[in-house]
Regions:
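Phosphate-centric recognition/catalysis
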Residues: 1-13, 161-189
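Positively charged, polyanion-binding regions of nucleic-acid-associated proteins
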Residues: 10-26, 31, 104
Length: 189
């Protein structure tokens, strides 16, 4: 590869994107990736290169990794069928979440922004502060403002990290509420 940052060869452009995505600790946004190149790249061109890179990896014999888009951007990750093997590297127990935590998270995800009072009204019971703290420590929810009523209660909404952990690009990709209530969705830690 040439030493200049002005690359015109499509394969070299894809190689730069590939190495940046493979070595990044977190998903890269389109803005992050445009900064890789001295001449600002059009978003349409960048998306085309990412689509080609995704296809390149999918077309490999026995692909082990895949390029995915999540709420925070793009990242490479192991294909799901290799998860059981990778879990052996970190034999920590999968976190178990109480019914209260899962119900609270579901209410926030589907009805956001909501106050604790809204959650309590929907669930019919008081929300334990530890439930909210656990979801905030996990970086799945955050305070996004206050409702303009007496007492100005905090409004909670899900975070990009919540979407990233579920491999979702947006809340629109959540299953319909009816489906969610009928199935168990495993949440990796």
């Amino acid at each position: 590869m040439s030493q200049t940052s002005n690359i015109t060869n499509i394969n070299e452009l894809k190689n730069v994107l590939e190495v940046a995505l493979l070595t990044s600790q977190a998903p890269l946004s389109l803005d992050d990736m445009t900064r890789l190149f001295s001449d600002r790249m059009e978003r349409a061109t960048l998306r085309m290169l990412l689509d080609e890179l995704k296809q390149d990896w999918a077309n490999r014999a026995n692909p082990t990794m895949e390029l995915v888009q999540v709420a925070s951007g793009y990242r490479f990750q192991a294909r799901p069928e290799y998860g059981v093997f990778l879990a052996r590297l970190n034999p920590e127990k999968q976190a178990k979440y109480s019914r209260a935590v899962m119900e609270t998270l579901a209410i926030i995800a589907y009805r956001q922004p909501v106050t604790r009072g809204d959650i309590e009204e929907i669930r019919g019971v008081a929300v334990n502060p530890n439930v909210m703290r656990q979801l905030q420590e996990r970086d799945w929810i955050d305070v996004v403002g206050q409702r303009d009523v007496p007492g100005r209660p905090s409004l909670y909404a899900t975070t990009k990290n919540f979407l990233d952990d579920l491999n979702l690009r947006s809340l629109a990709e959540l299953p319909p509420m009816e489906d969610f209530a009928q199935q168990e969705i495993p949440l990796d830690t």
